[in-house]
Amino acid sequence: MRITDKQVAVLRAQLVGNREEHLRLADQLDPDEANVCYTALVAAAFIEAAEERFIRNGDAVDHSEVIDFVAQVRERADEMPDIIDPQIAESMILDLLGKGSMVDADPDTKFGHQIVLLAALVGEKQFTEDQLDAFLGNARALADELLQ
């Protein structure tokens, strides 16, 4: 399986905050696409965004910067403390950086955390359309690698 333009369009719509378009496009994905390919695309985009945000000059940032980021994400909306568990969110990032290990969580919980953290990371960058396209292209290439 490979990542399709349709799957990239679903993620793009979500990351630019176009909820209606995101839901419309997501409804068009077949369940296998959504469960395998789209999940891999989100994971790859999360990896790309987190590494860009939390690795500087080849070194991972301190734990405190990850903790501060997660706290800021949880403060952005009233419902965020109910959506984002700080222990899970921090462990996802720290595991990716090689500074900790992922706490036990079911796949749906991990995916939900990934997508919210990804949206926050992309939102911080304030990408132009061209920059977002380049970011999604990199994520797509990584996702294709993950699926092999």
How should these model regions be labeled?
Residues 1-22:
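Short N-terminal edge-element motif at the start of the domain
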Residues 17-58:
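N-terminal interaction modules that seed assembly of large macromolecular complexes
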Residues 35-40, 107-111, 129:
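Alpha-helix N-cap/helix-initiation sites
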Residues 50-61, 81, 104, 125-129, ...:
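Long, hydrophobic, amphipathic alpha-helical segments used as structural scaffolds
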Residues 62-80, 138-148:
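Short, mixed-charge aromatic SLiMs
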Residues 68-123:
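Amphipathic protein-protein interaction modules
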Residues 122-148:
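Glycine-rich, aromatic-bearing surface loops/beta-hairpins
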